């Protein structure tokens, strides 16, 4: 998710992007992490001290990383797995449920989330993210992931109609 989003923002939109990641043995369903720093200017330090946006695809990740979110930051959760949010201010979609029911593969959850994020982030465009998927994924799994992306994007457009207009930078 982080790599594809970062690639799309850097290559397709011209932003400066750095990514750091931590994928331990808990990577499936646990608190793995990918940090992106995105800026229109060169980046001085590659790791964020506080987060403008947090994507929590598991309860453990939400619990562990929420405290790093700025007071004005935005929280996006997979409502299939995150049932207790530390704030009432969040966006959410049942990403795991969408992946299971519409794609037939729970491993597509992160790409469903990417589709949803593309709707809510004003600086991400669907065509750019699709090209990023094409550039980063093997051909044998591309079609399935494009379907997952579209499912997440369309569901977010339906359930979060205001999308990017809700975003403000601090």
Predicted feature residues:
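Active-site cofactor/cluster-binding pocket
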Residues: 1-170
């Amino acid at each position: 998710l982080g790599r594809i989003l970062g690639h799309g923002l850097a290559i397709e939109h011209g932003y400066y992007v750095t990514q750091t990641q931590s994928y331990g043995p808990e990577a499936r369903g646990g608190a793995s992490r990918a940090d992106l720093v995105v800026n229109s200017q060169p980046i001085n330090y590659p790791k964020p001290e506080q987060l403008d946006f947090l994507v929590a695809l598991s309860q453990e990740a939400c619990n562990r990383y929420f405290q790093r979110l700025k007071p004005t930051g935005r929280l996006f959760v997979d409502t299939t797995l995150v049932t207790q949010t530390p704030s009432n201010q969040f966006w959410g979609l049942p990403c795991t449920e969408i992946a299971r029911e519409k794609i037939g593969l729970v491993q597509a959850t992160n790409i469903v989330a990417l589709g949803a994020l593309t709707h809510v982030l004003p600086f991400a465009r669907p065509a750019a993210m699709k090209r990023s998927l094409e550039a980063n994924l093997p051909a044998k799994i591309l079609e399935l992931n494009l379907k997952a992306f579209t499912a997440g994007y369309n569901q977010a457009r339906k359930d979060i109609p205001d999308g990017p207009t809700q975003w403000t930078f601090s």
